[in-house]
Amino acid sequence: MKNIHQTAVVEDGARIGEDVKIEAYAFVSKDAVLGDNVTIKQGARVIGNTQIGDNSKIFSYAIVGDIPQDISYHDEENTGVIIGKNATIREFCTINSGTHKGDGLTRIGENAFIMAYCHIAHDCLIGNNIILANNATLAGHVELGDYAVVGGLTPIHQFVKVGESCMIAGASALSQDVVPFCLAEGNRAYIRSLNLVGIRRRFEKEQVEELVKAYKFLFNQGVSLKDQAGELFEKTNDTNVKKMCKFILETTRGIPLAKGRD
């Protein structure tokens, strides 16, 4: 059963799942796909080739799927937004469609919790179980790993990669890549420590201990981070530690470290 308010605009061609609720003055475009049990609240807009997974909620005046804020974009076809199941997108968020400079899609995984006034720009790749606090701003092509958390009022520079289970503190400004399982803070943000709160929520005690040992080895003051990562990658059998090392070895924007580190 669909519950569509008489003042809502749902264009012909939109694919609407079961038990969908579309409130007053909301808009859903002809190319949109809404999964089952989706709620589009008052005044929200779902535009263009946008897919929203089951059990997701788009709150009032959020705009999902509008064209990118990119001066090189010229109405390319086959671009859009894909959002996984159980997403919560709060008031006044903006999520832009992808461009042909990426694969054409802005992607957000399952169980995303995106608070009011956040912005996700074109071609971002967002993992599962992420949290963006109020006014977090992701520029184009940013990648967030699973379980990443971005604090309020924090901008992230285009093409930056944030690893899984990272925490970027509120009111920071991030312009380089953050190693999985780490916490970064400051303007400009640099890595301060492991994200112990986050990893203790996800992993067993023994796994946490391996990450603590790896962090101490990698971030030893005065030693090259990439040299340490290369050495540890060959020595360890721990999957999470290998992820940390691989990330460091493959970064293109560099890792933000305290002054005096390389």
Swiss-Prot record:
EC category: transferase
Top-level taxonomic group: Bacteria
Subcellular location: Cytoplasm
Pathway assigned to this chain's UniProt record: Glycolipid biosynthesis; lipid IV(A) biosynthesis; lipid IV(A) from (3R)-3-hydroxytetradecanoyl-[acyl-carrier-protein] and UDP-N-acetyl-alpha-D-glucosamine: step 1/6
Keywords noted in UniProt: Acyltransferase, Cytoplasm, Lipid A biosynthesis, Lipid biosynthesis, Lipid metabolism, Repeat, Transferase
Record EC number: 2.3.1.129
GO molecular function: acyl-[acyl-carrier-protein]-UDP-N-acetylglucosamine O-acyltransferase activity
Chemical reaction(s) catalysed: a (3R)-hydroxyacyl-[ACP] + UDP-N-acetyl-alpha-D-glucosamine = a UDP-3-O-[(3R)-3-hydroxyacyl]-N-acetyl-alpha-D-glucosamine + holo-[ACP]
One BP term from GO: lipid A biosynthetic process
GO CC list: cytoplasm; membrane
Family according to the record: Belongs to the transferase hexapeptide repeat family. LpxA subfamily.
Physiological role: Involved in the biosynthesis of lipid A, a phosphorylated glycolipid that anchors the lipopolysaccharide to the outer membrane of the cell.
Assembly and oligomerization: Homotrimer.
Name the UniProt record assigns to this protein: Acyl-[acyl-carrier-protein]--UDP-N-acetylglucosamine O-acyltransferase
Gene: lpxA
